[in-house]
Amino acid sequence: MKIAFLGPAPPFRGGISNFAMHLADEFSKQKHQIMLFNFRNQYPGLLFPSGNQYDSSSTDLPSVRMLTPYLPHSWSKTLKAIQDWQPDLLIASWWLPFFALSYGYILKRVTCKVVILAHNIIPHEEWLGTRTLLSYAFKSAHKIVVLSRSCLLDLKRTLPNNISRRGVLGFHPIYKPLQLQRYEAQAFPGLLFFGLIKDYKGLDVLLKAMPIIRLAIPDIRLRIVGSVYGSSRIYENMIQELELKANVECHFRYVPDVEVANFFAISDVCILPYKTATQSGVIATALSYETPIIASDVGGLGEYIDHEHTGLLVPPDNPPALAAAVIRFYNEKMMEPMREAIASQKDSNTWAELARLIIE
């Protein structure tokens, strides 16, 4: 089968690009013919205040950089290129209404089967006309694969039945990690907050929880690893005001894949204090490194965490509850049992299973 992908791929950085690359690699292993119809430009600088949109990642799969979603003249060029390649299936990565006009234009004109791979249905930030934009982009899809029950529910709530009934529940597979060398003898207990930092991810909630945690675990250390969408000043000010400089280590930058293992190797638990969510690639990354997770019980996060076995779930936007979970994690010595539980479950939810669900 000839399978085309529409959306970001390397050298664009981030979870959407990474997900598409892993899925395309899986289809390639299954002897399908692959073509990545990549973005030439993804966002105007105004919509991407966290710096460079690229990293050093690459792929050996065939890829052409053509589409700029906010430049209409690129839409017809991308459409023609897809049609000339004559795919049997087009998989479009979706996560923001920003792409609705360009995707809608292309998807309703291609002659092959269309699958939308939806990482989100309702965006974390408010967008004017979300329902209309979703309807326009999604109406040409033969199948809409979502990655959590929360997203499937959003799809049914937001779009008319003639579109939403095409929704299919998928999942976020666990990544195959780079080699990880655990450092068993830690100088201090280590928490990790990982990934692109936006307000909805609740880093402020975690920082407010830290003084409570420190009372019970004086040598606790939190590593914050990820670029900030906007300015890091708000978090730097909180760290100073809460007198957390001795307990918080900040790496406000994008971390390429080759460095990711280093941070998980020296962390006991990954914290996701999200205020809202659908699903999270950070969970898949943490599980790939057999790192337990403490996360807010919002959206689809709980679908990927087995409470009290692979992690702990807490109410959102609640620093005392988050602090209590962290303290319990250490007091009850949960780290090793949770790592073992994660290791026993890693063979489920594979890329091969997701690929089968998409093409069946």
Give residue ranges: language-model regions:
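N-terminal strand-loop element at the rim of the active site
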Residues: G7-R13, A24-D84, C151, R166, ...
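A conserved mid-protein helix/loop that constitutes part of the nucleotide-sugar donor-binding site
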Residues: S17-H22, K198-I212, A284, P320
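Donor nucleotide-sugar binding/catalytic pocket of nucleotide-sugar-dependent glycosyltransferases
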Residues: K139-Q179
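Conserved donor-binding/catalytic core segment of Leloir-type glycosyltransferases
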Residues: E184-K201, L207-M210, R223-V225
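A short, well-ordered alpha-helix in the C-terminal region of glycosyltransferases
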Residues: D219, M334-S348
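Nucleotide-activated donor-binding/catalytic signature segment of Leloir-type glycosyltransferases, i.e.
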Residues: Y235-V258
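Acidic donor-binding loop of glycosyltransferase active sites
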Residues: N262-T278, T291
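Conserved acidic donor-binding segment of nucleotide-sugar-dependent glycosyltransferases
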Residues: H307-E308, L312-P319, R328-K333
